[in-house]
Amino acid sequence: MSTTPIRRSASRRRTGFAVLLGLTLVAAVVLVIARGADGATATAPVSGYVPPVKHVFVINIENKGYDSTWGPSSAAPYLAKTLRSKGVLLNTYYGTAHNSQPNYVAQLSGQGPNPQMQGDCQVYSTFVGATTAAPGQAVGSGCVFPASVGSLPTQLQAKGLSWKGYMEDIGTPCRHPAVDAVDPTQKAKVGDQYATRHNPFMYFSAITHSADCARRNVDLSQLPKDLASASTTPNLSYITPNLCDDGHDSPCVDGRPGGLASVNAWLQVWVPKILNSPAYKSDGELVITADEADSPQSDSTACCGEGPAPNSSLPGITGSGGGRIGALVLSRWTAPNSWSTTPYNHYSLLASLEDIFRLPYLGYAQTIGLNRFGLDVYNNGWNS
């Protein structure tokens, strides 16, 4: 008996399945795409898709609420208009705490705040605590976590992936105060506007005690050299401007205006270097956000079910979070001039980065139901 009809039947089944799968994916995209009143494309949350990103760049600006950064009268038009037109704006993205320091720590570890962290760690104090609470929270007080507390950088290293923190004005690599001493970088100085509290790597003993900390936590001036090729660009590049260029100070100690005007000028210099790099062009993603809204008094709102933490009943001091700040994601997998209304926060960002690098979730990134970037963010080129 001829077997040709059997082969044809199998082929038809495979073809039918492929067509059905394609229609399902197309239908999913159709369902998530809508047209906003301002002409931008809005997307609703869809989970389960992670593009083949291999190089991620994260930039934080300081203490800027959503309206001041992204609104029509923004003093940073390069960010709010030029760059915004190139990617997807997450317009319900929130900080997780007040003041600055715990937001940076949240992005790298999923750890919630405690009172010392909420006070920006005026003393570079040892974290003291012997217990944990779900989800993955170290219970105690202080700022510098023991080696037992995990972080995204240590996860990456364990998997053979690379990372670097690029800190403007750090000068000496891996620079931090003496343990349990007052932090002398709380206020900018002429010629040195580095702030330890904006360098979250320095709050994990597993990093600061590592033999290669000085190779991985470096001055921003090293970034152009590392961007020269994809092979020399870390899988994670975490970039922190100084206290003037991140918009924290206004005016700045060197006479510049500070605020969003200085943010705008800094981004115009550094973002093109990233966007034109081989790593970004090949498989890169750039995330630009703020650490928190302007102040605990102006906005301490939260999203994503954030509530009391084991070490702080009010992570935002006057409320549950760090306020609405927004975030911009640029990538070949993000559609220009698009936006997402899905609620996200810094724990969502951590979980999304762990998705990209196929890592287990840390701390509050484990939260059940926490939104992670999906087709609402990666809304372009998913079928290419």
PLM features: what roles do these ranges have?
Residues 2, 7-40:
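Secretory targeting and sorting signals
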Residues 39-384:
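N-terminal pro-sequences and low-complexity stem/linker regions of secreted or lumenal proteins
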